[in-house]
Structures are given as structure tokens and as C-alpha cells.
Curated annotation (Swiss-Prot):
GO annotation, cellular component aspect: plasma membrane
Positions that bind substrate: 24, 129, 164, 278
Full protein name: L-lactate dehydrogenase
One record GO biological process: aerobic respiration
Catalysed reactions listed for this entry: (S)-lactate + A = pyruvate + AH2
Membrane topology field: Peripheral membrane protein
Matching SUPFAM superfamilies: FMN-linked oxidoreductases (SSF51395)
């Protein structure tokens, strides 16, 4: 199969992965309106092409949270990445290190913090959920510190899991889910051998010690569902800010007031995100939510964004809307599922080339020069 764009990896992953895994990453909440809007609203933003601007030296280099990056991209925390390729989180961490960008490990990763950190040539970031079990959270933070994690990404948009109907149809959840997953795996022999068999263990490395002999996917999902904490407030997070001395990013912000609250709380950054359309269907797309949030916090808070970013052009659009960097989730997972570490690295190369072209043709040569002036709407 010819891979010329990041979207090609979606088709390749669909061919290679069992349905329950592909639909888990590909799907969204309810009728998936927000999932689709994330992409379409970005695509509707027109770039302002310029000519004769001397764009001989275009650089994607930038700095975020004290780190020098090859481009303003972070590989997102994606749960169960170790099911998309053998020890998938390790492969993603290596790809990120080779491309000199950060990788953020999910709480619900197959590979543990310690395994991924020991296999990566650069320090990783770590994502943590708000959970009722404060002992687990404190232990996870201590483990992250010990493993050399530099940056904490705190996800706050999951006081309860979203309703993802596609998962019930695919076998990720619902009646007879386990036998359905087995039957699907049998139709994908390459995945069944390389990941299903040789990629063991398939437990969630950061959680398994809390579950004892309960090791099925349903056990993990049940533990998480029972531990999401709808009573949490900003005050409940003060101990985390005191405990974690490194950069702390709040992920899941869609409202300007919540962005202001994150600033008052002492966060170093936020991620404007609707969880890829996987939580509440009908909320604003990230592209529409981002500008008023940037206006609300100005330069006092580093604003990142995710959801709907499928190309280097989309990265440039998000930067023009005010983000300082973006997180890639689905694009990373598709590439990982299709071709492991090599796929992720090639996907990042594609994004970099697309960014380079977009910057060249809009007349900017550095990330710092990208702003609303390169958008047609800004000059209409």
C-alpha cells in the first residue's frame, strides 16, 4: 500500500487491526458529530498564500516548557497503545526521541512508566487522570518522578467516561465482547502473532498491581469507570501542584473561564481539547474553542491544542489560531497500528514536510511568525 499522507495510515491500520481496536481509536461519543466537526472546522479555515517573501530558510524548531523541539508536535497519551503494535508505547517513545519531540505516556498504557522510560533515549511526559484512589495517583506521581518524567499532563475532562456506541458494536464492550474480540483477532493473523501472542503481557502496566488476579479488559475498564471522580474541584488538585515541581499541563479545556481558572491554579500550560470527540458529543470543535481561550489567557499560559489534526496544514492552522503546539493522537495510533515505530516516524516526516510547504507558501520562516495574519479570515 502506498503511504503518501497521514490519512493513508488510517486505511492501513483498518486493514491490519482487529475491528475492536480500530474502532476504539477511530470512533467518538454518541453520533460522533463533534468528532467530525473537529476535522471539518479545521479544513474550513483558509490559509493566506503569499509570494516573493524570501522563504529560503524555513525552520520548524521551537521551545516548549524548557525543551528544544524539532517541531511543535507532541505525541499524545493514547490508552492501550501497546495493543496496536508489540510493546507499542515503547515504539512510540523511540520514534519521538528519534524525531526530537515529546511523547506523553497514558495512565492506561500497556507498558509501564518504568518500561517506557528505560527504553527511550529522552525523558518522557506522563498523563494522569483524576481518580478517586488518591493513593494510586500519589504512587503514579512518585513513579513518574523516579523514572525521570519531565512534564505532567493532567486530564480533567473525564469525571465520567463518554458514551461510545461504536465500542458496543465492535466488541470493545457490550454483550459477548470477549469472544467477539477473539474471533476478530483470528481474521488478522499478522496482528494475532506479533501483538496478540508475542506482545504479551497485555495488562495495563501502571494499574495491574492494583487489580491482583483480575486481568481481563473488562476488569481494567471496570476499575477505571469506578475510579473516575465526578466530585473533583480545583481545590482538590492543590496537593498535586505542590507535589509536582516540574511543568504541569491541564488537558481538556474548552471554556475560557476554565482556562483562567487553570492559570489561577498555577498550571504551566493547558491543552484545548474535547478528547478527540470521545467525551461529550455536541461540544465545540477545538478549532472554534481555541481563539477565545487564547484571548482569555494571553501569553500568561502556554496553550496547546489537539483533536482533528490530520496533516501538517492542520498544525499550521492551529498555530495560526493561537496554539503554541499540538498533540497528535489518532494520527499516531493509525501509524503505529499500520507499521509500528517506522510508521510513526514516517508519519512525523509527512507532517514536517506539509508544515514546511504551508509555511513557505504563506510567507513565514519560523514557528514564531505563524499567527492569524496567515489566515484569510484575518484579512477579510
Amino acid at each position: 500500500m502506498i503511504i503518501s499522507s497521514a490519512s493513508d495510515y488510517r486505511a492501513a491500520a483498518k486493514r491490519k487491526l482487529p475491528r475492536f481496536l480500530f474502532d476504539y481509536i477511530d470512533g467518538g461519543a454518541y453520533a460522533e458529530h463533534t468528532l467530525r466537526a473537529n476535522g471539518s472546522d479545521l479544513a474550513d479555515i483558509s490559509l493566506r498564500q503569499r509570494v516573493l517573501k524570501n522563504v529560503d530558510n524555513v525552520s520548524l524548531e521551537t521551545r516548549l516548557f524548557g525543551e528544544s523541539l524539532a517541531m511543535p508536535i507532541i505525541l499524545s497519551p493514547v490508552g492501550l497503545s501497546g495493543m496496536y503494535a508489540r510493546r507499542g508505547e515503547v515504539q512510540v517513545a523511540r520514534a519521538a526521541a528519534n524525531k526530537r519531540i515529546p511523547f506523553c505516556l497514558s495512565t492506561v498504557s500497556v507498558c509501564s512508566i518504568e518500561e517506557v522510560a528505560s527504553q527511550s533515549d529522552q525523558a518522557i511526559w506522563f498523563q494522569l487522570y483524576v481518580l478517586k484512589d488518591r493513593g494510586f495517583m500519589k504512587n503514579a506521581l512518585e513513579r513518574a518522578k523516579a523514572a525521570g518524567v519531565t512534564t505532567l499532563v493532567f486530564t480533567v475532562d473525564m469525571p465520567t467516561p463518554g458514551a461510545r456506541y461504536r465500542d458496543a458494536h465492535s466488541g470493545m464492550s457490550g454483550p459477548y465482547a470477549a469472544p467477539r474480540r477473539i474471533l476478530q483477532a483470528m481474521t488478522k493473523p499478522d496482528w494475532a502473532l506479533n501483538v496478540g501472542l508475542l506482545g504479551r503481557p497485555h495488562d495495563l502496566g501502571n494499574i495491574s498491581r492494583y487489580l491482583g488476579k483480575a486481568t481481563t479488559l473488562e476488569d481494567y475498564v471496570g476499575w477505571l469507570a469506578n475510579n473516575f471522580d465526578p466530585s473533583i474541584s480545583w481545590k482538590d488538585l492543590e496537593w498535586i501542584r505542590e507535589f509536582w515541581q516540574g511543568p504541569m499541563i491541564i488537558k481538556g479545556i474548552l471554556d475560557p473561564q476554565d482556562a483562567r481558572d487553570a492559570l489561577s491554579f498555577g498550571a504551566d500550560g493547558i491543552v484545548v481539547s474535547n478528547h478527540g470527540g470521545r467525551q461529550l458529543d455536541g461540544v465545540l470543535s477545538t478549532a472554534k474553542a481555541l481563539p477565545p481561550i487564547v484571548q482569555a489567557v494571553g501569553s500568561d499560559l502556554t496553550v496547546l491544542a489537539d483533536s482533528g489534526i490530520r496533516s501538517g496544514l492542520d498544525v499550521v492552522r492551529m498555530l495560526a489560531l493561537g496554539a503554541k503546539g499540538v498533540l497528535l493522537g489518532r494520527s499516531m495510533a493509525y501509524a503505529l497500528g499500520a507499521d509500528g515505530q517506522r510508521g510513526v516516524e514516517n508519519m512525523l516526516d509527512i507532517f514536517a514536510r506539509e508544515m514546511h510547504v504551508a509555511m513557505t507558501l504563506t510567507g513565514v520562516t519560523s514557528i514564531e511568525q505563524i499567527d492569524a495574519s496567515i489566515l484569510v479570515k484575518a484579512v477579510a
